[in-house]
Amino acid sequence: MQYFAGSLSALSLILVVDLPTDQRSAMFKQLFFGAGVLLMVQSARLRWMLLDRYRLLRSFVVGVLISVPLALLISPREALAIGMLGSLVVDVCLVCRAAWRIDETQTKQFFSALREGPDHLVERTIGLNLLGFGIISLCVSDLGPHVYVSVLPRDLRVLVFFFSVLLIWMALHHGFAVHYASLYFKRKSQTSDSSAESIFEFPGGHSPVFFDFVYVAYTVGMTFEMSDVGARTTEVRKIVVVQSLLAFLYTTIAISAFISLFTL
């Protein structure tokens, strides 16, 4: 596909050479304008997918659209739990899709131009995910033997709780992945020395894509440590420690909740 696109571009340039100067200039302006618009559209799409304030707004809209109609059929708590699960599914799928598809150039352009405060990114990521875990815990707190009026079977409610906890865990680490990528390219853009130390040392020496930062976040979340990617600055080591502690705390609470569910 890239070979075909390159051949088509070369053929277009050959054909343009034979055009008059004014027509050739107008055509180049259209090409550059179209490329600029395309970059703006791609940047806006990535912001909508990855930044937490847009993720929160999107999740709220999806949750309301699912919960309100369901509240007419089942209990409000059950409707809220299913609505939150639906919003988490949409959010995680969009972030994973972006991580899987964007390349080195798109990653560098997007995160280099990002003007998000690193501290605010971490605070919002932690706050929103703890809030989400609290809401889903409240929604399924009726799984014990003394249940009020419930429409859904207990096994289905346990399933909703399980997948919600899993997706909240993924959303937590997606937020840290965005933070790591933002911090990495921010430090890169602040120094003019190409040999200056970066916050991460990726094996292979290639320019990282967003998926590499998702990999780092998942690795810290699952093993509570760095693996083959090295943390090279004190600043990023502090963030890794915070993420490890949060992941450990979250995992401990989730395991305790699951054990209590199956022993009721």
Where are these regions (language model features)?
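Membrane-proximal soluble regions of multi-pass membrane proteins
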Residues: 184-186, 190-229
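Short, hydrophobic transmembrane alpha-helix segments
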Residues: 18-22, 68-81
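The first (N-terminal) embedded transmembrane alpha-helix
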Residues: 5-11, 51-70
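Transmembrane alpha-helix/helix-exit interface in multi-pass inner-membrane proteins
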Residues: 166-189
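Alpha-helical transmembrane segments
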Residues: 75-91, 157-172
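Hydrophobic alpha-helical transmembrane segments of multi-pass integral membrane proteins
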Residues: 9, 61-63, 122-139, 215-219, ...
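Juxtamembrane helix-capping/reentrant segments at transmembrane boundaries
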Residues: 108-127
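Pore domain of cation channels
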Residues: 212-219, 227-264
